[in-house]
Structures are given as structure tokens and as C-alpha cells.
Amino acid sequence: MNYKRNVLAGLVMACLSTVPFVYGASAEVGFQQVVTQPELIEVSTAGRAVAMRKYHEVLNYPEGLHIKVNGVGYDMVQQKHHNVTGIYVLDGTKLTVHKGLQVDLSNAHPYDQADEMAHYYMSGIYAGFGRKQIDDPKYDTQVVVHGPTVIQAVGNGVQANKDSYITLDGPVKIETVPFEQADVYAAIVEEGSIGIGTSRLADTYTGTAPVSTPKPSQYATVQVTGNVGVLNKNYGLNPNPGRHGSYIVMNLGTKDSVWTGAALNEFAESGNNPHQSGVTLELKNQATWHNRWIGAKRHRSGHEELLLATGKGYTFTGSHIQTLIGGDTPETAGIIYQEDTEPIVVDVLQGYVKIVDRRPNATNTTAPIRVISNRGQLTILK
């Protein structure tokens, strides 16, 4: 490929050659239609590695963008973590990429610790701290990618925090690596929003708006491996103000579209969801969702106290989908493979959906899914 090059090179210490393997180092990228002449930003270091770090800037890449990052997320000698991230935009930055984005994120020793802050230090795309100085929508942080997006990340795929919004119109391929202790996600929001496989800008989402979104004339292929998280950052350093909701909208509308992972909604888990934060999943035309939690469960402050006081906490007790939109006919139904021990909870079901019960603990007395408001048709298959 003929790249325009903007290379930031660091030294990779010789000691890295002793590492038994490098997370993400040998990943193969599909979606070869990614643009032929993107600008390339490449960083390789023995510690912190961030390819793009921008504050309150307006950036436009008309010919596409390719990010390559190789860093070390955790110094085992000094017991110190480092940020290893592809795109890190904050404080009202507006980033628009045309003709496609590719992010390759490798990490010799990721920060795989049971730390509620671990997911902040490793993302393909991180957008945060919108409206840091002035509470006005024009100071939101925004990332919009038109065309193919391919993210292969050690850590999160995409993360949108306070007053920050990411829209990937597609096609989209996101692959993450499961950790043993740290919780990481294909998509994660904390008082921000993310749209995957949709042209509707993420800063327009509300608790009910995605349900009435006009149907696209043609769906893009979406392939996602990793959990999604709607988290309530009401603790620790820089807690969110709680002015509005957190939303993920993901459209799987082609036969080759697939999501493997589960959905954590801390607002729904705790029973305190004033802005109806959650996940809207469109699943039709025989697209598939393999529901199973991947990797480590989340550790966070306040869970035990809330559980003791109310009987509800923040931890994952099953995938929670705010709105599930199935096919328009039985022939165009979406398909769920329920492979997790915990049940799926759907607030609102629209359209036709089939669910195949593959739970390892399945019994005839427990259902693989619970639908609170059924406005469609659900078929359960064994």
C-alpha cells in the first residue's frame, strides 16, 4: 500500500524479545477494501504509546487514516501502567475521517489488573472530556468515520466518555482480546454515545430516539468481537455529572454481520436509570449475535454497598438490551445464540427474532431470554 507517512518512532527495548507473546501482534485484518492511500501514523515504544493525542482541535482526513501502535501497557519492574491507545481525542476535538479507518493496537504487556480504571489506558479510539470548559454542545468531543472501520485492539475497541460521541457508519470490524483480570469492551460508553453500522450521528441518541430511526436503505456489514458496556462513572476521579444518558446503537442488518459478546448496563443492573441509558441492537436479515461474556468481569467501587442497601448492584447478571429490533418478516429474522449462563433481558422487542438455546446450564424451567415489552415475535429453538 502506498501511504502518506507521519511516523513517530520510539525505541523498542531488546528485553521485549524475551516476552513469550505479544497480544494482538499477529492479527490479520479483513475488509481489504480499506482505502489505498490513507495517512499512516505509527508509534512503537517500550512504554506509553499514543498515536494521536488531540485537545480542542478540528481534524479532517479526506483520504483515510491508518493507525499502528505498539507499546507496553504495564511495567512489571516499576509496577506502573502506561497508556497504549490509537486515537486519544479530548476537550471538544472534532475528528472526521473519510474513506475508512484502520487501527492496529499491539501491547506486549497490557495492564491486565483487577482495577476499575484499567479500561481507560488502552483503546483503539478514546473520546472524552467533552464540554470540559464550557457546557455547550458545540464543545462536545466527536469522532465520525465514513467508510470501512477496522479496529484490532488489545483493550477496548472504541470508548466514548463524558459528552463525547463516536459514529462509525460502516462497514465495521472490531476485534478485542479477552483479559484474565481487567474488563475491556468492543464498545464502552460513560455519559457518551457510540453508533456502529449507522449513519445517524451518536450525539443525537436518546433513550427512545433510536427506536424511531428511519431504516437505512442498505445495511453495512458489522462484525464485532467483544463485550459492550454502558457504565455509570459516578465514583472516583472525575465522576460524570449525570446530565444525560449513555447509549450504544449497533446495527447488524446483513447475513454476514455478527456480534460475539455480552452487554453490561450498570444503570439497568442498579435499578437507577433516569435517562434510560442502554443498548439498541438491530438484528435482522439472518445476522447473528452469540451472547456470551468474554474475559474478565468488571470490578468497581460502590457495588457491595449498593447491593447491601438495595439488593441490586452494578455487576453483570446477564446481557441487558434496551431495544431489540428484529426482522420485518419471519424470513428476515435475526438470530441469537444464547451461550451464557445468565439470561438475556430485553426491555422492548420489535420485529422477528429467533433464539437458539445453547446455555451450558439450560433447564426446562428457565428461559434463555426475558422480554419486558414484546411488540414483535420471538421464537425459541433448542
Predicted region positions:
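N-terminal intrinsically disordered, low-complexity tails enriched in polar/charged
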Residues: 4, 25-38
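All-beta strand scaffolds that present successive hydrophobic residues in beta-strands
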Residues: 31-37, 58-63, 94-100, 135-137, ...
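Catalytic-site microenvironment of enzymes
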Residues: 63-65, 109
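Glycine-rich nucleotide cofactor-binding entry segment
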Residues: 103
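Extracellular beta-strand/loop-rich repeat segments of large surface/secreted proteins
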Residues: 225, 247, 254-382
